[in-house]
């Protein structure tokens, strides 16, 4: 961004340290609040598009009053003649889910935990008319202790100029299921921004089910991915998703070994079906069927 850099002071108080990420027309910075002597994250948006900047600030104001530990906390909001800014809690020590998934898929029960927490956080914003609409693995932050937080609720959609239609709950439900798919397979199943992940594989022109890519996929997660991403069905809201996959572990589930199947190569088409996933049991959550 022209005119700002490390050392720039915003509102006479917030010192920019280093850029953290760029989404659409806004940049997140690692910063320092010189008044309270604490590290913060700043979302800085140029006011060359005043309507967009106003939408970002409006979304941030509504998000600031949602008290939920799964959402990135907003401390301050402001603007001057050049910039609009949103001051958030420090997230510089967290890793994005995209970064974690660049190392490979996660254990299925860790996917359940992360997506359950994300869904519960998004559900808390629904009462304020807030929807994410731009959910990707880059929006999910994981602390060193495993706490899950969602960034960009409302503001990412405003930055993108997304239409605030009446399908926000369903779009976020699809986004959460896409996160589950990515967590299970390490690939992104939706069009648009992949957050650096590879595109999901297809089989005979259709999106491969997670169980066709990796082993050990619980039946309920496999079915939710199929219904939501391939059949335009599945959960209608993040809260609906959370209810369907509950309960989940309150603590992180660590990786033990790679779950990638050697039977399913990352092809884009072809009619040869992969080797069948592990057989089903009476408990649908134990493993997915072929």
Where are these regions (language model features)?
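A conserved loop-to-beta-strand element in the N-lobe of protein kinase catalytic cores
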Residues: 81-89, 97-98
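Activation segment signature within eukaryotic-like protein kinase domains
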Residues: 114-115
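Catalytic-loop of the protein kinase fold
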Residues: 122, 126-143, 152, 157
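ATP-binding glycine-rich loop module of kinase domains
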Residues: 18, 24-53
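AlphaC helix of the protein kinase catalytic domain
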Residues: 96-106
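AlphaC helix of the eukaryotic protein kinase fold
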Residues: 44-66, 72
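Activation-segment/catalytic-loop signature of the eukaryotic protein kinase fold
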Residues: 77
């Amino acid at each position: 961004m022209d005119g700002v850099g490390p050392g720039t002071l915003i509102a006479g108080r917030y010192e920019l340290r280093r850029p953290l990420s760029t989404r659409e027309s806004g940049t997140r910075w690692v910063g320092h609040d010189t008044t309270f002597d604490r590290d913060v994250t700043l979302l800085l948006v140029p006011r060359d598009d005043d309507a967009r900047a106003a939408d970002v600030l409006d979304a941030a104001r509504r998000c600031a009053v949602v008290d939920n530990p799964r959402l990135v906390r907003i401390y301050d909001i402001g603007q001057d003649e050049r910039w609009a800014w949103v001051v958030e809690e420090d997230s510089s020590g967290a890793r994005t889910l995209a970064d974690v998934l660049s190392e490979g898929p996660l254990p299925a029960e860790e996917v359940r935990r992360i997506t359950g927490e994300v869904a519960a956080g998004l559900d808390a914003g629904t009462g304020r008319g807030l929807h994410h609409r731009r959910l990707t693995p880059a929006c999910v932050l994981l602390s060193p202790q495993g706490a899950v937080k969602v960034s960009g609720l409302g503001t990412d959609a405003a930055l993108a100029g997304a239409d605030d239609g009446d399908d926000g709950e369903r779009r976020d439900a699809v986004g959460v299921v896409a996160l589950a798919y990515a967590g299970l397979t390490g690939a992104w199943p939706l069009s648009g921004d992949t957050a650096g992940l590879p595109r999901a594989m297809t089989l005979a022109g259709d999106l491969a089910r997670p169980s066709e890519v990796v082993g050990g996929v619980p039946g309920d997660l496999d079915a939710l991915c199929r219904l939501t991403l391939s059949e335009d069905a599945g959960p209608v809201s993040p809260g609906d998703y959370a209810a369907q996959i509950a309960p989940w572990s309150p603590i992180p589930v660590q990786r033990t070994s790679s779950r990638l199947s050697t039977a399913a190569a990352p092809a884009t088409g072809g009619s040869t079906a992969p080797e069948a996933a592990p057989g089903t049991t009476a408990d649908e959550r134990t493993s997915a069927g072929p």
